[in-house]
């Protein structure tokens, strides 16, 4: 256990940040999973709706400083490519 006041504060801060980061990591994982599942089930409309939500949320995380800009762009690009490929198969 911590012996100094500053160390106790650091422990509290670390716990708070860990909890917040866990929330965002889970949210990002669930967002991308929703798009991938919609693509896997060959449901183009559901995939496009999920992609819209993913695009909005990932860019929101960039503006909050949670994700680097290029990381979000890469994730959105890959999701968009999979949805586009699905749309091409159906059409």
UniProtKB/Swiss-Prot annotation:
Q: What GO biological process term is on the record, naming one?
A: translation
Gene Ontology CC annotations of this record: cytosol; small ribosomal subunit
One GO MF annotation is: structural constituent of ribosome
Its domain of life reads: Bacteria
Q: Identify the keywords attached in UniProt to this record, alphabetized.
A: Ribonucleoprotein, Ribosomal protein, RNA-binding, rRNA-binding
Role, per record:
Binds directly to 16S ribosomal RNA.
Family according to the record:
Belongs to the bacterial ribosomal protein bS20 family.
Instruction: Enumerate the NCBIfam families for this protein.
Output: S20
Instruction: Please identify the protein, giving its name as recorded.
Output: Small ribosomal subunit protein bS20
Whose protein is this, by species? Wolinella succinogenes (strain ATCC 29543 / DSM 1740 / CCUG 13145 / JCM 31913 / LMG 7466 / NCTC 11488 / FDC 602W)
**What lineage is on file?**
Bacteria, Pseudomonadati, Campylobacterota, Epsilonproteobacteria, Campylobacterales
């Amino acid at each position: 256990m911590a012996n100094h006041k500053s160390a106790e504060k650091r422990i509290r801060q670390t716990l708070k940040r860990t909890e917040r980061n866990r929330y965002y990591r889970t949210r990002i994982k669930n967002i991308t999973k929703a798009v991938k599942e919609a693509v896997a089930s060959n449901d183009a409309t559901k995939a496009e709706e999920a992609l819209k939500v993913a695009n909005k949320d990932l860019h929101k995380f960039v503006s909050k400083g949670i994700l680097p800009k290029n990381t979000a762009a890469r994730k959105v690009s890959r999701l968009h490519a999979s949805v586009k490929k699905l749309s091409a198969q159906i059409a």
